[in-house]
């Protein structure tokens, strides 16, 4: 994994995966898309979508545990505070050789700079909410969200996906 390359690609994802509008119906469509991907691949994930602190979609697939929802909450807190994907925040901290505690005094009980939460971005407005997935390795959580967003926004996934680690 090349940190700089991944951070550059995530910045591109955040620039291109933006909505013109987003409401409760949009949250349902996005959440349903994520759930369908999880069902097709037999993934045990929790999905949470919120806008302005209001939970609009929550789903826990078979095989998940309450801990998955807590991880989603902690990743969501990072995105809400930093206005960047939780994976980008974590990779930047890794690159800088620091942590959330050292950099911002944030308690790990409430914040997790791990992949799996992406800002819901409105063009011309910025971050209005989050979409979180928990249950897979962090890179996979992040990529699943990007895949669902790219499909919904009719963006070319091959231009946005992170490089394959294999």
Swiss-Prot record:
One Pfam family in the UniProt entry: HbpS-like
Coiled coil feature spans: none
Gene3D superfamilies (alphabetical): Haem-degrading domain (3.30.450.150)
Family listed: Belongs to the UPF0303 family.
This protein's name: UPF0303 protein Avin_29320
Higher taxonomy: Bacteria, Pseudomonadati, Pseudomonadota, Gammaproteobacteria, Pseudomonadales
């Amino acid at each position: 994994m090349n940190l700089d390359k991944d951070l550059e690609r995530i910045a591109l994802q955040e620039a291109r995966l933006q909505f013109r509008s987003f409401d409760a119906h949009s949250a349902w469509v996005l959440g349903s898309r994520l759930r369908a991907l999880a069902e097709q691949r037999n993934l045990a994930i929790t999905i949470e979508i919120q806008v302005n602190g209001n939970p609009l979609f929550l789903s826990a697939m078979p095989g998940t545990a309450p801990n998955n929802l807590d991880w989603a909450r902690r990743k969501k807190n990072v995105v809400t505070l930093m206005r960047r994907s939780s994976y980008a925040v974590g990779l930047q901290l890794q690159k800088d050789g620091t942590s959330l505690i050292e950099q911002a005094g944030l308690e790990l009980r409430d914040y997790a700079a791990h992949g799996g939460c992406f800002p819901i971005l409105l063009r011309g407005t910025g971050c209005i909410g989050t979409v979180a997935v928990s249950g897979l390795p962090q890179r996979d959580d992040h990529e699943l969200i990007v895949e669902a967003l790219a499909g919904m926004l009719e963006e070319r996934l091959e231009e946005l996906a992170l490089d394959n680690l294999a």
